[in-house]
A protein has these predicted regions:
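ABC ATP-binding cassette signature C-motif
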Residues: 1-217, 267-323, 329
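Intracellular alpha-helical coupling/juxtamembrane segments of multi-pass membrane proteins
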Residues: 206-238, 242-248, 252-258
Length: 332
């Protein structure tokens, strides 16, 4: 693999951001990292790039791998020009031309302008151009679509999808994630979960994982009540060979007392997509009375409608198809 992360742990004081996580990224893989705000996405990026330390674990890159890193908040010398910030070899005509082409796509045209005169958004675009110009083997991108308009985002989608690029990125733009990434890593409850598919696949499999967790907790609660009664007895009533059962009880207690909070990762549809009606149907059910019998037309219907997608509804009964459309419109 290009990157192999083994048993990585990071904490701030008493707060553990991630605990003993492991994952790998192979050549040609495009991986998106998602998590709730404040759970450590950018910190994980910084740790992987050795910008921050970590408590334990190993980070192993393939030998001689060239890595390009886009930070969330890049810093520049305010006196240097855009071209100097992007490229140190101004006497190389071919590379200067490439720099100008990429900067133009990102709407940065004055290459002699001092970086200190640029807005924060313009500086982020210069930083993005700087990473792309160097043509690294492995791209590490923290929020690459921040401060980009629709035209720039679509250009960047095409650029990243050309060739066999290897990418690891953090983004809150679900459309960009769908267009570029073929694997999603979720950082949740200090653990990494891997989903080999797009955002819709991630949502479906994550829901399955949460349902299984709820079932496990409920089962543990039932068993916990029984074991708690046993633990409350006098020690002599338990028997002398029950140490293993006591240990198992405390492990069971941890599971039974878990609380599943609303840990849903909410990625945004960037406001630059105005004009496209995008919506999600999640577990929609619809039934009606048909001459005294229950007629089901939708049963846990789940679908994410993507930008520019065109879908037709077919069936045996035209009125039922209309009901489906009406039901979707009512949720608009």
């Amino acid at each position: 693999p290009y990157l192999d992360v083994q048993n990585l742990t990071k904490r701030f004081g008493a707060q553990v951001l991630f605990d003993n996580i492991s994952f790998s990224i192979a050549e040609g893989q495009k991986v998106g990292l998602v998590a709730r705000n404040g759970t450590g996405k950018s910190t994980l990026m910084s740790v992987l790039m050795d910008k921050e330390g970590h408590e334990s674990g190993d980070i192993i890159y393939r030998r001689d791998l060239k890595v390009g890193y886009l930070e969330q908040s890049p810093q520049f010398d305010p006196e240097e020009s855009v071209l100097q910030a992007c490229f140190n070899h101004e006497d190389d005509p071919e590379k200067v031309l490439k720099a100008k082409q990429i900067l133009t796509q990102l709407h940065i045209t004055n290459l002699e302008q001092p970086m200190g005169q640029l807005s924060g958004g313009q500086q982020k675009r210069v930083a993005l151009a700087n990473v792309l110009i160097t043509e690294p083997d492995f791209l590490m991108l923290d929020e690459p679509t921040n401060h980009l308009d629709l035209e720039m985002i679509e250009w960047l989608e095409g650029y990243l999808n050309r060739g066999n690029k290897t990418i690891f990125m953090v983004t809150h733009d679900r459309f960009f994630l769908d267009k570029v990434c073929n694997t999603i890593l979720e950082l949740d409850d200090r653990t990494i979960y891997t989903y080999r598919g797009n955002y819709a696949y991630y949502l479906e499999k994550r829901q399955e994982r949460m349902d299984n967790l709820r079932a496990e907790i409920q089962h543990s609660k039932n068993l916990y009540r029984r074991e708690l009664d046993w633990m409350r007895r006098q020690p002599q009533a338990r028997g002398h060979k029950a140490k293993y059962r006591e240990d198992a009880f405390y492990e069971l207690e941890k599971v039974a007392k878990q609380r599943i909070e609303d840990r849903q990762v909410r990625l945004k549809a960037s406001t630059v997509y105005i004009g496209s009606k995008i919506f999600e149907c999640q577990y929609v059910s619809k039934a009606f009375d048909d001459r005294g019998q229950k007629k089901v037309i939708l049963d846990n219907f789940y679908y994410n409608f993507a930008r520019f997608e065109k879908m037709g509804i077919v069936g045996n009964n035209r009125s039922e198809e209309r009901r489906v459309g009406k039901e979707c419109r009512s949720r608009w």
